[in-house]
Amino acid sequence: MAKDIKFSADARAAMVRGVDMLADTVKVTLGPKGRNVVLEKAFGSPLITNDGVTIAKEIELEDHFENMGAKLVSEVASKTNDIAGDGTTTATVLTQAIVHEGLKNVTAGANPIGIRRGIETATATAVEALKAIAQPVSGKEAIAQVAAVSSRSEKVGEYISEAMERVGNDGVITIEESRGMETELEVVEGMQFDRGYLSQYMVTDNEKMVADLENPFILITDKKVSNIQDILPLLEEVLKTNRPLLIIADDVDGEALPTLVLNKIRGTFNVVAVKAPGFGDRRKAMLEDIAILTGGTVITEDLGLELKDATMTALGQAAKITVDKDSTVIVEGSGSSEAIANRIALIKSQLETTTSDFDREKLQERLAKLAGGVAVIKVGAPTETALKEMKLRIEDALNATRAAVEEGIVAGGGTALITVIEKVAALELEGDDATGRNIVLRALEEPVRQIALNAGYEGSVVIDKLKNSPAGTGFNAATGEWVDMIKTGIIDPVKVTRSALQNAASVASLILTTEAVVANKPEPATPAPAMPAGMDPGMMGGF
């Protein structure tokens, strides 16, 4: 395929046009009085959102050179979202500011490499200064404040703080669509996995269609149970204890399933069979998690174990197990605290080394199931469009809250970025390095300027007053008042703020040091084939 190539000023100018188109679309959403953006969808109703990364991912420009600029800013938003889960709009605003200020100086003859060096030095100083002024987040009320600021809803803040209190900071908090109009919180204590009973005849409560097992034994295997003779000796031993049994296996079929069901119906003993969760290697890991949680052993060929040789010592135990048609919940497994702690440490070490987003998500789920439980925030809204918008806001709020707990908080509304200006300005740099520092100094003001602008105030006036205000005092754009930001609950997680700045500086520096851009040449449209001579157009069906 033929290529189009642009050089130096032309290349940078084309990319900056793309940067501006994306950034100008995203930045209208910043702050408490930010507006919404409507996104057309190929199917269904349009999506109305103020989530920066969602908007950025939707933007595709016709001009290839402009589109490359837009995609680089979209990458800033995505990367910030991956690391901190929020702050994507701030990252976009900072990127645009650094690119614009930098381009002025490069056009005037400054060396882009020197500018890049200055930007990197200034950014590192700003990040260290942010960490130095961060305050730790502890307590339900502080967590609720962080979530409320991100979601613009005190109610959502309460749900998230309640969920984190119930399942712990490492706990799984999932966000689902509710069937009703109200948003509600549901907490499932213990380990839950998405496999239900293999036969409805195994239920103990016909009204709720669930099987409740009190103080059960648990048989855990990655094998298929087809022949009842394989587990008959074990069943006879369990029968003597007069306690129920849960079988977790690759599958239970053949003669084994009807035999178990028949004994259950006759009241011989209470047994429930479910399929093992997950697939492949992930299934083995999850079965091992269940075994450690319940104090049992996975009966697997990997360990040289056979079902027919299994004894009571291989069975796990729990205080209670509830099984419905879709899921199984194990409460208060009998595994040793030390073994569970070691397993949690192993999963955390795997989390640190994995590079796959999918693997990271699954490891976090496993960690949470071992560490405490699962909280589900069920989002309700009057319409599907409102539901999608609310769900995105709650996801952002949850991510921001986790980030706040991890690294602490700083004054929100862009105030913290203004606070660190003094430290960055004190850097003793010369030449183009000093120019790079000055570019960052100007960019640090931009989030406050945009928040004020979106709220109908003059940004420059707000910034001047902010620079001369006591530490911690900032501008509440929602009310137009000057307040103590942290006491008022206007806060940002330091992880969100620093990630936004670091990612913006990194990509903006790359754009400024770009000297050539190569794009695919658009292919000319292929003309439609000519109609054979003598063919009646009516034969084409009238199209």
Curated annotation (Swiss-Prot):
Binding site for ATP: T29, L30, G31, P32, D86, G87, T88, T89, T90, G413, N476, A477, A478, D492
One Gene Ontology MF term: isomerase activity
Catalysed reactions, as listed in the record: ATP + H2O + a folded polypeptide = ADP + phosphate + an unfolded polypeptide
GO biological process, one term: protein refolding
Record Pfam families: Cpn60_TCP1
Localisation: Cytoplasm
Class in the EC hierarchy, top level: isomerase
One Gene Ontology term, aspect cellular component: cytoplasm
EC number(s) recorded for this UniProt protein: 5.6.1.7
InterPro entries referenced in this protein's UniProt entry, alphabetically: Chaperonin_Cpn60_CS (IPR018370), Cpn60/GroEL (IPR001844), Cpn60/GroEL/TCP-1 (IPR002423), GroEL-like_apical_dom_sf (IPR027409), GROEL-like_equatorial_sf (IPR027413), TCP-1-like_intermed_sf (IPR027410)
Domain of life according to the entry: Bacteria
Keywords: ATP-binding, Chaperone, Cytoplasm, Isomerase, Nucleotide-binding, Stress response
Function: Together with its co-chaperonin GroES, plays an essential role in assisting protein folding. The GroEL-GroES system forms a nano-cage that allows encapsulation of the non-native substrate proteins and provides a physical environment optimized to promote and accelerate protein folding.
Record's subunit section: Forms a cylinder of 14 subunits composed of two heptameric rings stacked back-to-back. Interacts with the co-chaperonin GroES.
NCBIfam families linked: GroEL, PRK00013.1, PRK12849.1, PRK12850.1, PRK12851.1
Family: Belongs to the chaperonin (HSP60) family.
Protein name from the UniProt record: Chaperonin GroEL
Species: Streptococcus pyogenes serotype M1
